[in-house]
Each structure stands twice: as C-alpha cells, then as structure tokens.
C-alpha cells in the first residue's frame, strides 16, 4: 500500500506530492497495525466505537475482510456495529449511471444466509447492543421498504 502511494510525484508548481501520513500511518484496514492504531486513537479521544459499512449483494460481499479480521482478533477491543450499505454500487460520482453491482434482496433463503453470516458478529462481546439487542443501521431505508 505504501509503495503505491509513494510513487506519486510533484506534477506542477504548488502541487505537493507525495503526501506521507504522520508516522507513515497509511490507511490499510487489512493491516492489523492500522486497526490497532485506530483503536488506540479512538480510545484516546473518547470515541466509544466504530460503525462499519457492510456490503451484501445477494450473497456476494465486498470489503468484508477487515471486519472478519476484527472478529478473530480480541486485541482489537473496540465496540463496533454495522451499517448495511444496501444500495447498488454505481458510477454516479463520475456522471455515469452505470451500475457495477446491483442491490438485490432476494427471497427468504437469501435473507437467512445473510442473517447466518451476521449472527457471529452480533454474538461477539464487542458488538454494540442496546438492551441486549444488536444495533445497526441501513444506509438506504427506502430501498429496503420498496423491495419488500
């Protein structure tokens, strides 16, 4: 990760490249040291926990590895929860309407598979709960309501 970013170079006058983060702390959530650093920083400044985006596209997941690593590593002892980013991935930010990954909610079988995947996180002592119930959020409530 760091090597790729440090290959940047000054392109025009006033253009400051490469930008090296403080203490070489590149943002790489697959790196345990990054997660430990973020956890320590959060605790130092009184942040209770993190809410991670969760991507589930009819059984296909994206960016799930960091949370799976957290689940397996008790040293990353910071409360967390999920926000289900339940919207199609598209290229709207480029001005195009191209859908890269459509959001599809599926039938009862797909919902059960999704639940079965999430329940291991909900049962983790670090997962944020209120009155013993796991908390979370939906990115796009209307889409869920319209689909059901």
Name each model feature, range by range.
Residues 1-148:
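Glycan-processing catalytic domains of CAZymes
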